[in-house]
């Protein structure tokens, strides 16, 4: 025991000068972060450490232990009276951190002692948003069973489904859709889950979203569609999935076509895919440019020339 106290004072005395916290409080944070249960118990039982003491960012020892995945330390802090739903300055709670890191055992423990799914970070993020973005399907399942709102939104309008689609977490996408997530719910800038999945090249997510009724031609505020972005970024697998649902190959609200985007992207394979789907190389964009006017790539020009001579047929 004497050894633990000496370690605590030596390691953290200098930290209190920087953070204006007591050495013992800093030692408790260190023990929670490292999973040193014996030291944590010693410090808490000394009566000289406030159970919900915070660092300069409002982080508590329970949040630290939850983030780091130390089940026994989390349980000890809870049993000694730590506030489970205490919020950091950013609005995050212990549940948020455990969900973000995929510590399903700690998420379960926090729920057993009354953790709430309703708290939001300053950007609107919830524990469900964090788990979906990070790809922790088991945690997502637990959160949904314990009342997490599947329609939560970040300040920019992104939903849990949007975040999972953006990161390519197809299992979570399926979970959310099966639990009632709105497949076409856009972000404030008009970006839908399908659009973002297509841009990022997540073909399996695109496939699932389309099969569950995603609008293949939903456009963002700038007029671009999922096919337009996939074509521009050269995501052939995504293009193939989208073409199965007959998306628009004509002029979009942005005054351009997917073929224009493919040509600008510079990948001959995407150009070939669109031409085989009957994209018209004779359509001009809002600047009166043909797709072929937008490149000096000889491979692409050789692909386009016969089509143009044949009138796009």
Describe the function of each predicted region.
Residues 52, 85, 118, 151, ...:
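Ankyrin-repeat junction/capping positions
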Residues 23, 56-57, 89-90, 122-123, ...:
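Ankyrin repeat start-site detector
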């Amino acid at each position: 025991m004497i050894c633990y106290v000496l370690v605590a004072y030596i390691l953290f005395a200098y930290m209190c000068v920087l953070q204006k916290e007591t050495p013992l409080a800093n030692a408790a944070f260190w023990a929670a972060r490292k999973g040193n249960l014996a030291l944590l118990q010693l410090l808490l039982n000394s009566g000289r450490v406030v159970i919900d003491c915070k660092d300069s960012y409002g982080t508590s020892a329970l949040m630290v232990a939850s983030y780091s995945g130390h089940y026994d330390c989390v349980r000890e802090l809870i049993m000694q009276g730590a506030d489970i739903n205490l919020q950091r300055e950013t609005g995050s709670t212990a549940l948020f951190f455990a969900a973000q890191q995929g510590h399903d055992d700690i998420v379960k423990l926090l729920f057993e002692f009354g953790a709430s799914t309703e708290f939001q970070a300053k950007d609107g993020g919830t524990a469900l948003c964090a788990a979906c973005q990070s790809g922790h399907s088991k945690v997502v399942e637990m959160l949904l069973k314990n009342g997490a709102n599947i329609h939560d939104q970040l300040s920019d309008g992104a939903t849990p489904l949007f975040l999972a689609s953006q990161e390519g977490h197809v299992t979570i996408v399926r979970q959310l859709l099966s639990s009632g997530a709105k497949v076409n719910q856009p972000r404030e800038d008009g970006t839908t889950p399908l659009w973002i999945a297509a841009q990022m090249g997540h073909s399996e997510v695109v496939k699932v979203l389309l099969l569950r009724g995603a609008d293949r031609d939903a456009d963002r505020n700038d007029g671009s569609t999922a096919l337009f972005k996939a074509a521009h970024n050269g995501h052939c697998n995504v293009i193939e999935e989208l073409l199965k649902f007959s998306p628009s190959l004509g002029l979009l609200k942005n005054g351009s076509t997917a073929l224009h985007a493919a040509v600008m992207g510079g990948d001959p394979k995407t150009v070939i895919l669109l031409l085989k789907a009957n994209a018209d190389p004779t359509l001009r964009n809002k600047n009166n440019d043909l797709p072929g006017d937008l490149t000096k790539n000889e491979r692409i020009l050789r692909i386009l020339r016969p089509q143009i001579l044949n009138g796009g047929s």
